[in-house]
Amino acid sequence: MDPMITGLGVVALMGAAATIAGAAEDLESDVGSQSNPNSQVQLAPQMGHLHRIINKAVSGEPVAYGTWCGIAGSVAYVLMQSMQLPVIMAIAVGAVIAAMVHTTYAVTSHMGRIVSQSQFNQPLFMDMLVQHLGPIAGHGFIVTFCIVGLSYLMTLPIPGFAHPFPLPLLAVLWGITIGAIGSSTGDVHYGAEREYQQYPFGGGIPVAIHGDITTKAELGARNSMDVVHFCAKYGGPLTGFAFGAIVFLSFWNTIVFGITGGIISGLIIVLLLIILNNRLEVFARNRYGPYKEDE
């Protein structure tokens, strides 16, 4: 088979895995209030808003997912090298162990944050905590499985791949990357839209309203399940598309045009994306802008 066709097939598989991982990563951070909006949840009791929202951020998303993916990649690497376990099984076992560590940190982090707010009469809802551990662990498993699988594909002895870095290191680097993408792409669809629905859309989140979050849902008190359900419609898929496009475009041009041609085509793609992003933002601001009351 033509090496270029094989390489493009691997790149397509990597792009698909990256798309799934990106969507799951954003939704996991939404259900657990990790990344920028978590500070707003933490400030809510001080603003007089007692809530039933998970607040588990032990760190920023890049550091957290670098850790989870590094754990999964290291376990998978050891199982493949020492026990000759099949690739899929080794990656799955690594992702399970990473999900267990992830869940442990989620519990301790949430409890620690909530207890620190007890002076503002914020209670610890155990039922809410237990109900949200499944989505946190499940989304985290999907992310680590896809990222470690993507990293493994980079090590295959195929022209354009055969990366010299070992699997655990690649998993850490891609974990940091997906954490950064999820933090920068998906945040606005949680913090600005769902958490501050009582404020006009398009006006940003000034410091004066930090912590003044929405605590009532369509029926009853709002919880993180409501948030992740909302974000699954747009924020999650958009984050997955962004990360999948980054992975695909990063490898596709090198496979097709070679190293020098890939660098040139990559610069052209980046320039086109900058122009497209500017035109899209200007159009959106001019067309929609902030919400205005009827006169």
UniProtKB/Swiss-Prot annotation:
Pfam families reported for this sequence: MtrE (PF04206)
Pathway the protein contributes to: One-carbon metabolism; methanogenesis from CO(2); methyl-coenzyme M from 5,10-methylene-5,6,7,8-tetrahydromethanopterin: step 2/2
Known role: Part of a complex that catalyzes the formation of methyl-coenzyme M and tetrahydromethanopterin from coenzyme M and methyl-tetrahydromethanopterin. This is an energy-conserving, sodium-ion translocating step.
Species assigned in the record: Methanothermobacter thermautotrophicus (strain ATCC 29096 / DSM 1053 / JCM 10044 / NBRC 100330 / Delta H)
GO terms of biological process kind: methanogenesis, from carbon dioxide; methylation; one-carbon metabolic process
Name recorded for this polypeptide: Tetrahydromethanopterin S-methyltransferase subunit E
Description of how the protein assembles with itself and partners: The complex is composed of 8 subunits; MtrA, MtrB, MtrC, MtrD, MtrE, MtrF, MtrG and MtrH.
Transmembrane segments: 4-24, 60-80, 87-107, 140-160, 161-181, 234-254, 255-275
Family, as annotated: Belongs to the MtrE family.
Cellular component terms per the entry's GO annotation: cytoplasm; plasma membrane; vesicle membrane
Protein's UniProt keywords contain Transmembrane helix: yes
